[in-house]
């Protein structure tokens, strides 16, 4: 049996940058074991499989696999899969914005697809309501796992905290780009720290950026998911936005910002984040988006 697939680069406007994603637009009765085997063979941070939805609101149901396991939600798979399905004509497009609903493991979430001249552009997803874990008090285990002196973490003057808008990630602030470049993660040790916190990934960021229009520079490590480093992580961009809002880093009058990621991997990415807040300034709605570029189309023999 041969299964069609498409590979796209997400959170970029040019090929061979951003975060690559394999999309199987028709899962054709594959078993869970076959889906996992295909994801392992593709060896990308995620591979998605599109099925008929069980929720009548949804345009489709998407299952997401890393090389190691199935996960209930992820950012760049949501954006990239919606783009592929829009280009394939799987639902009607209306200018300037087409809203669809995408069924994933955490529920059915809305996505807005920007459309110009009948062509899909940026895809923006609405993530779940943010939730916040306890602040990490002992800096030594995470510092050792990242190959840093604990004093470097202390210089950031911001807390290390697990945050979720669908998937929980440990948000780790650094003071500057120099310390970001000095990261030498011990993935086994980092996996232990993340498991102890119930987090999927470690999203390390600094407010010092390379691009003048970016607000934060980030790197992502998810060893438990089989992803040593990820070039663009939408599921962590939302939690970072909520974190920056709660800790007073993002000005109240600022509603959106850009995260640059993947630069150290040679796959520069740009993730757009929008924050809506209540009267007290607490984040209520998180939207994350970006553009997608098609790269490869082919078949997988199963």
Predicted regions, residues:
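Active-site proximal loop and beta-alpha junction motif in alpha/beta enzyme cores
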Residues: 1-74, 79-302
């Amino acid at each position: 049996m041969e299964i069609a697939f498409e590979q796209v680069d997400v959170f970029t406007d040019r090929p061979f940058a951003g975060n690559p994603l394999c999309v199987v637009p028709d899962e054709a009765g594959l078993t869970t074991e076959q889906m996992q085997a295909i994801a392992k063979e593709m060896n990308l941070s995620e591979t998605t499989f599109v099925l008929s939805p069980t929720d009548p609101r949804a345009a489709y149901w998407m299952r997401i696999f890393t090389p190691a396991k199935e996960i209930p939600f992820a950012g760049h798979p949501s954006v990239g899969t919606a783009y592929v399905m829009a280009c394939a004509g799987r639902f009607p497009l209306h200018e300037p914005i087409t809203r669809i609903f995408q069924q994933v493991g955490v529920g059915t979430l809305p996505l807005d697809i920007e459309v110009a001249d009948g062509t899909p552009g940026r895809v923006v997803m609405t993530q779940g309501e943010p939730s916040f874990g306890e602040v990490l008090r002992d800096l030594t285990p995470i510092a050792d796992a990242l190959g840093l002196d604990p004093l470097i973490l202390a210089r950031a003057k911001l807390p290390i905290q697990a945050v979720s808008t669908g998937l929980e990630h440990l948000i780790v602030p650094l003071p500057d780009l120099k310390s970001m470049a000095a990261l030498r993660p011990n993935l086994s040790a980092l996996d232990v720290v993340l498991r102890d916190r119930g987090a999927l990934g470690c999203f390390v960021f600094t407010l010092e950026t390379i691009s003048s229009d970016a607000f934060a520079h980030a790197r992502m490590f998810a060893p438990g998911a089989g992803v040593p480093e990820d070039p663009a992580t939408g599921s962590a961009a939302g939690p970072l936005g909520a974190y920056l809002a709660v800790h007073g880093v993002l000005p109240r009058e600022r509603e959106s910002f850009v995260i640059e990621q993947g630069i150290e991997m040679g796959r520069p990415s740009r993730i757009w984040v929008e924050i809506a807040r209540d009267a007290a300034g607490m984040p209520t709605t998180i939207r994350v988006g970006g553009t997608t570029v098609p790269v490869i189309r082919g078949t997988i023999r199963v």
